[in-house]
Amino acid sequence: MSDTEDNKNKQTTRRDFMVLTASSVAAIGAVCTLWPLVDSLNPSADVLALSSIEVDLSNIAVGQTVTVKWQGKPVFITNRTPDKIAEARAVKMSELIDPEADQARVKAGHDNWLVTIGICTHLGCVPLANQGEYDGWFCPCHGSQYDSSGRVRRGPAPLNLAVPPYTFISDKKIRIG
């Protein structure tokens, strides 16, 4: 009788070993199969390289708008005149389609620099600088008009021109992204 009990214990032990081994092999196989899939979700090297750019502002004259490319999108960098800043700040919030104060769209201490993504918020066209009734941007596709702060004033666009994440590295250099 003790031989039979020993056999049952050995069979159970062998079975447990086989289940554990098979489970381990299956788990390792699953990890080896899923690893490339998960790794492919990471951004590629060229995307990481474009994730942030530095822009020298010293060549942008007062009243001038320059377009740079960031993550495949046009970004408008405008060195606004004191008159345009005063004009943008005088606008009543009730007159705006997407109310946002001019001060919220620029960095404190750098009120003359406006940085916006140059894509119309209606259907994605690229607006023209220093155009339109409000002397800001005019979208030639469907007629949306933005003021000198990039806020939508007229037309089908529902939102203001987006402000990308950016920081001032120095008074004459910014990092976008």
Curated annotation (Swiss-Prot):
Compartments in which it is found: Cell membrane
Cited InterPro entries: Rieske_2Fe-2S, Rieske_2Fe-2S_sf, Rieske_Fe-S_prot, Rieske_Fe-S_prot_C, TAT_signal, Ubiq_cytC_Rdtase_Fe-S_su_TAT, Ubiquinol_cyt_c_Rdtase_Fe-S-su
GO-annotated cellular components: plasma membrane
Cofactor(s) essential for the protein: [2Fe-2S] cluster
Free-text remark on how the cofactor is bound: Binds 1 [2Fe-2S] cluster per subunit.
Binding site for [2Fe-2S] cluster: 120, 122, 139, 142
Protein keywords: 2Fe-2S, Cell membrane, Disulfide bond, Electron transport, Iron, Iron-sulfur, Membrane, Metal-binding, Translocase, Transmembrane, Transmembrane helix, Transport
EC number, as in UniProt: 7.1.1.8
Pfam families in alphabetical order: Rieske, UCR_Fe-S_N
Span of domain Rieske: 88-175
Gene3D superfamilies: Rieske [2Fe-2S] iron-sulphur domain, Single helix bin
Enzyme class: translocase
Main location: membrane
Residue ranges crossing the lipid bilayer per the database entry: 18-38
Catalytic activity: a quinol + 2 Fe(III)-[cytochrome c](out) = a quinone + 2 Fe(II)-[cytochrome c](out) + 2 H(+)(out)
One MF annotation (Gene Ontology) recorded for this entry: ubiquinol-cytochrome-c reductase activity
Topological category with respect to the lipid bilayer: Single-pass membrane protein
Functional description taken from the UniProt entry: Component of the ubiquinol-cytochrome c reductase complex (complex III or cytochrome b-c1 complex), which is a respiratory chain that generates an electrochemical potential coupled to ATP synthesis.
Assigned protein family: Belongs to the Rieske iron-sulfur protein family.
Subunit structure: The main subunits of complex b-c1 are: cytochrome b, cytochrome c1 and the Rieske protein.
Note: The Rieske protein is a high potential 2Fe-2S protein.
Protein name per Swiss-Prot or TrEMBL: Ubiquinol-cytochrome c reductase iron-sulfur subunit
Organism: Rickettsia conorii (strain ATCC VR-613 / Malish 7)
Lineage summary: Bacteria, Pseudomonadati, Pseudomonadota, Alphaproteobacteria, Rickettsiales
